[in-house]
Amino acid sequence: MTDDSTTGQGEDARFSPLPARPGKIVAIHLSYASRSDQRGRRPAHPSYFFKPSSSLAPSGGTIERPAGTELLAFEGEVALVVGTAARRVSPEAAWDHIASVTAANDFGLYDLRANDKGSNVRSKGGDGFTPLGPELIDARSVDPAALRVRVWVNGELRQDDTTAGLLFPFAQVIADLSQHFTLEPGDVILTGTPAGSSVVVPGDVVEVEVDAPGAPGAPSSGRLVTTVTQGEHGFDGSLGSLPAVDDTQRAEAWGSREAAGLDPEPEPFVLTPALRAKLERTPVAGISAQLRKRGLNNVSIDGVRPMHPEAKVVGTARTLRFVPNREDLFRSHGGGYNAQKRAFDAVGEGEVIVIEA
C-alpha cells in the first residue's frame, strides 16, 4: 500500500474510519459454509490468526503485488469493531460488546502461504493487505445474522453471501476469543470470507460492501475500493524464505483448477460392488497370472494370506512406504503427526493399506 496520507485532524488515514489504531486484528480461517464446501473441508471449531494494524488501509488506496509473485487474492469480509472490553463473555452477551460493523478486504498472497504454515504473518500481513471501511454501521441497528457481503472486481460481482451462511455465529466467535484474551475497544475481528474469492492482478479494481438490506434504512458500509498495482520490490532469499507456488496453491487461490487454467484432476478409480464381487470370486493365483500376462512380473500377490482363513480382503490399495529414520526431516514432514499416522487415520471402508518396509 502506498497511501500514507493523513486526515485533516492529523490522524493516519490508514485507520479511518476507526476511532483509533486498533490494538489487534483477529481473523478467522474458515467461517462460511459456502467457502468450506468450496475448499472441501468443514472445521469443527473456528481457528484464528492475527494481522498487524500496519496492514490496514482506507478506501480509495492501492495494494502492491510484490515483484516475483502471482497469487494475490481478495477476500471480502464483515469486520466487527469492538466497543467495550470483553473478557470471558457469554454468547448471549457477546454482541453487546460490538460497536459497529463495516467492510474489509482480507487480501492474501498465496505465494507465501506455505511458508507461514497457517500463521499468515507474511502472506496476509503486508502493508495495505487489510483495507477497511469506508463507513461504520451501528451494531445496534442490525441483526448480526442478516448482514450481506458483496465483492466486485472491475464491476463484475464475484462474491455475494449473507451471515445466515456462517458456520460459527458472530456471538460464538466473540465469546470464544474472549475466553483466551481480552478484546479491547477498537480491536477488529475479521469474520471470514464466503465462496468466490479469487486472484486479482495489477490494474484490477476491487470493491467490497457490507450492508443490512432488511434493517430499517438498509444501512451500508459503502463500497470499499482498492486498486491493485505492480510492486517494484521482491524478496531477498538471504534473509528468509522466498515465494513458492504449485498447482495446489494456484487452484486454491483462483478457486478451482479450471479458473487457474489447469487440467482437471483425473477421475479417481472406483471399486464398484460388481467388480468387488467378481474379484472376491477370482482365485488369487488367477489374478497373479493376469498381472504377469500384462507384463507386471514384480507385483505378484501369490502367497498373500489374510489373518483369518475364511476372509478375503478386496479393496483399493494405498502404499505406505517406510524409510530410514531422518531426524532432520521430522519437522518438515509433519512432526508427530507424520505420513504414517495420517495414512492410518485416512483409511476408509473398502480401502487397504499396503506397508512397504
Regions found by a protein language model. Give the residues of each.
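Extended, compositionally biased flexible segments
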Residues: M1-E77, T226, A251, R257, ...
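Catalytic-pocket segment enriched in acidic/His residues
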Residues: T2-L18, R35, R41, Y110-P268
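Short gly/pro-enriched beta-turn/loop segments at secondary-structure junctions
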Residues: A20-R21, A73-G76, W95-I98, D116, ...
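Extended boundary segments
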Residues: A27-Y32, D106-F107, K124-T163, A289-R318, ...
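Short acidic/polar capping segments at secondary-structure boundaries
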Residues: S31-A33, S54-L56, T84-R87, A104-Y110, ...
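Short, structured patches in soluble enzyme cores that scaffold and shape functional sites
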Residues: K51, G76-V78, V82-T84, T102-F107, ...
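Generic secondary-structure signature for well-ordered alpha-helical cores
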Residues: S54, A85-R87, A103, I137, ...
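N-terminal accessory regions of nucleic-acid-interacting proteins
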Residues: R87-V101
